[in-house]
Structures are given as C-alpha cells and as structure tokens.
Amino acid sequence: MRRIAIVHDWLTGMRGGERCLEVFCELFPEADLFTLLHRRKTISEVIERMRIRTSFIQHLPLAACFYRYYLPLFPLAVERFDFRGYDLILSSSHCVAKGAVRAPGTLHISYTYTPMRYAWDLYGAYFGDWTGPIASCIIPTLMGRLQRWDLRDRKSVV
C-alpha cells in the first residue's frame, strides 16, 4: 500500500483552501495530514477524522490565536516534517506547505492557491501597519528572507 502525506498550512477555519483540502481528505482518507497548527473544532468532520500531525508551532505561546506572528518560523516548521517512507506528498498551500522537503524517491505534487502574498505585497493587509524604527529595520529583512525561501522552495516540487 502506498503511503500518502497531505500537507496544509494551518487548520484554523473553513475557507477556500480548506474546502479543497476536504476533497483531498475524501480522496485519500488513509493519508497522514501534516499542518503547522490545528485548532480543534474549527474545521470539517472530514478533515478532523484524518491523522493530523502538527509542527512545533502548535506548542508556541499563544499560537492558537496569534499564529501569524510566527510567520518567520513557518519555513523551518514545514521543513522539519519527516516524510521518509512516504510515496507521495500532496501539499495544499497558500503559504509554506509547498516547501515540504521530500525524501529521495518521493513524489511531491503541490496545489498552490497563491504565492505567499503577505511576504510579497500584502504584509500590511495581513498584519497591520507596523511603524517605528525597529519595525522598519526588522520587517523588510524578514520579508526578504521569506521571499527568497518562497522562490527557492519550488525546487522540492516535482
């Protein structure tokens, strides 16, 4: 039997990406579902029935409510998932799930909804308008790193 891993950015509500994820879960109910963060009872029963594996982000202080502020850690979190022994990785991504690192011989198919827009042009829309000398130094540096990662991580997908 083929082992399948589904990777989704986070599970905190039912929006468009989660509706697609729900279909993937119906197609592959035996798959393991990897995600950065899972807030129970915020997603459909179809998704809740999956074997859900979360990242270290799940255990960070206040992550359930303020997970977006951990954005600079998201690439590290998704890259730390261990996919050895899986034949297929199916990532459902609008952020970092597409950056799942495949093991040799593993096929990675990514359904990418959009680029990581908050790293490119919509940071203020997602996080508010941070101003001040510290934010004006740190934010562009962090966003530059995320942009480079966003471009580089495409190489994991075959």
Task: Please tell me what each predicted stretch does.
Residues M1-T12, L36-L37:
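Nucleotide-activated donor-dependent transferases that construct or modify glycoconjugates
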Residues G17-L27:
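Short amphipathic alpha-helix
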Residues I4, E30-A31, H108:
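Hydrophobic anchor at the start of a short beta-strand
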Residues L27-K98:
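Active-site donor-binding segments of glycosyltransferases and PAPS-dependent sulfotransferases
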Residues F28, G85-D87, G105-T106, R154-V158:
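Short, well-ordered alpha-helix to beta-strand connector turns
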Residues G128, G132-V158:
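Membrane-proximal helix-turn-helix segments that form the acceptor-binding/catalytic region
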Residues L88-S91, R102-G132:
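Active-site proximal beta-strand in glycosyltransferases
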Residues G13, K41-I43, A97-V101, R117-W120:
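Short catalytic/ligand-binding loop motif for oxyanion handling, primarily in non-cytosolic enzymes
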